[in-house]
Regions:
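Alpha-helical elements of Rossmann-like donor-binding domains used by nucleotide-donor carbohydrate transfer enzymes
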Residues: 22-29, 42, 70-74, 90, ...
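Hydrophobic alpha-helical core bundles mediating ligand binding, dimerization, or RNAP-core interactions
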Residues: 23-27, 43-47, 68, 91-95, ...
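A metal-dependent, Asp-based hydrolase signature
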Residues: 35-41, 45-89
Length: 239
């Protein structure tokens, strides 16, 4: 059996919070007649390409708030919307107001009794702090790509968590709903927990997944994850 993880580091967008549903609702409220689902999908589609520019060095270090704003302006132009600056700023900060999944808070509070919980997100620190306040997320520490000046899946992000807590990489478990994130963490020696989020991309959109047995644990939601982890290491966890 692997050693009990001491630190659970969580991906946030899609794993902890429902970005698609939250953004869709904000768009529909701000831009009457707009298809919120389609807008959310288009906005998110620019996320990885924008980070790739930073990771490649084509673009200097740029926090996610600023990347989101750049993509937002492009999506608004492409979809024929001329919002004033105030409304653009309000909509861009919708990423600070994302709603948690229904199981998130209960599962996290259960896990918090046994593990140290932190974020490992590409979101910037201010965004993650505001989101935690808005959604009531009980983090012990907020860590971000901004801390390491590297975006996931750069190894510096995963190994950075172990360095911050002064533990071995194997004592950190990444919790995520994205297999590529988990695979990159595993290469760095972290343990991995896959959590299914079938509605992440919106209604009617399903993603195919590979063999989940390659991960340390695979769970249906955060409550299931808490049960699996506490059952796997019943004598090693503090009471």
């Amino acid at each position: 059996m692997k050693p009990a993880p001491l630190i659970l580091a969580f991906d946030v967008f899609g794993t902890v919070v429902d970005w698609h549903g939250s953004i869709s609702r904000e768009v529909a409220a701000l831009i009457p007649g707009e298809d919120g689902d389609a807008f959310a999908t288009a906005w998110r589609a620019g996320y990885k390409p924008a980070m790739a520019e930073v990771r490649s060095g084509k673009l200097g270090w740029t926090k996610i708030d600023d990347l989101h704003r750049r993509i937002l302006d492009q999506v608004l132009l492409a979809r024929g919307h001329d919002l004033d600056e105030s409304r653009r700023q309000h909509l861009n900060r919708a990423w600070h107001r994302l709603a948690p999944w229904p199981d998130t808070l209960q599962g996290m509070h259960h896990l918090k009794h046994h593990f140290t919980l932190c974020t490992l997100s590409n979101g910037n620190l201010g965004l993650l702090a505001n989101m935690a306040k808005h959604a009531g997320l009980p983090w012990d520490l907020i860590l971000s790509a901004e801390v390491f000046r590297h975006y996931k899946p750069d190894p510096q992000t995963y190994l950075g968590v172990a360095e911050v807590f002064d533990v071995k990489p194997a004592q950190v478990m990444l919790v995520a709903s994205h297999e590529d994130d988990l695979d990159a963490a595993a290469v760095c020696g972290l343990q991995t927990a896959y959590v299914a989020r079938p509605m992440e991309l919106g209604p009617g959109v399903r993603t195919q997944h590979g063999d989940l047995s390659r991960f340390t644990v695979a769970a249906q939601d955060f409550n299931d994850l808490a049960d699996r982890l506490t059952n796997a290491w019943p004598t090693q966890l503090p009471t």
